[in-house]
Amino acid sequence: ALVVKGLGIGFFEAAAEGGEEAAKEIGGIEVIYTGPAATTAEAQIEVINSLIAQKVDAIAISANDRDALVPIGKKAMDRGITVISWDSGIGEDGRVMNLDPSNTALIGSSNIKWMKNSMGDEGEFAILSATSQATNQNAWIEEMKKEFAKPEYSKMKWVDTVYGDDLFDKSYQEALGLFKKYPNLKGIISPTSVGIVAAAKAVEDQGLVGKVYVTGLGLPSEMKAHVKNGSAKQFGIWNPIDLGYSAVYLSYQ
């Protein structure tokens, strides 16, 4: 089973495509693509309990909370189920392996560099993340702090970090809140494919294109229009299809 942070997110749907591709190559296995409607650890635990009851052979989880999912991971392993985490890790005691999407330090430093390239080397910016417990986003933000401490960013001011919980509407409202709280804001870094689109849409709707620039991690298919209209100059991502493919192969091994 491929368990994602939340259903209806394009990044994870692309990962599921890769998972299906791996399943076809392996042969004789079925991939159950599932996840909660709410992007919380509690909702994921319910999903995993259901999978344990179904006696699946393996569970590959992108975690909403590194620590809160350890007990349910242990429970699954005690039942003979292989548990790995991918994209966003579970604590070591709750899985046998973790698959990171890319180099954590590279992701963190790149986001700060993209922000500087987008807004210039002075002014205010903020972070719009996923959930406050998300393993991957929190690790990337720690790496952003290391990069941001370098002297070339001395005229830039990191004013806030807010959380949209990987929900479009909440992320959009958080972006609006940043505009209101920081009228001189020049940039938003959103290291989540949901948040970056929501932030770019908020910039456009508020007539702030050319004043506030959005960067972070997003899908090209979802960000194309926002780059064309100027709300985002640059952003990055790895291939989620390959990530899902690798997660299923590792689960099978």
Residue ranges and their predicted role:
Residues A1-Q253:
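A residue-level marker of the well-folded mature domains of exported/periplasmic proteins
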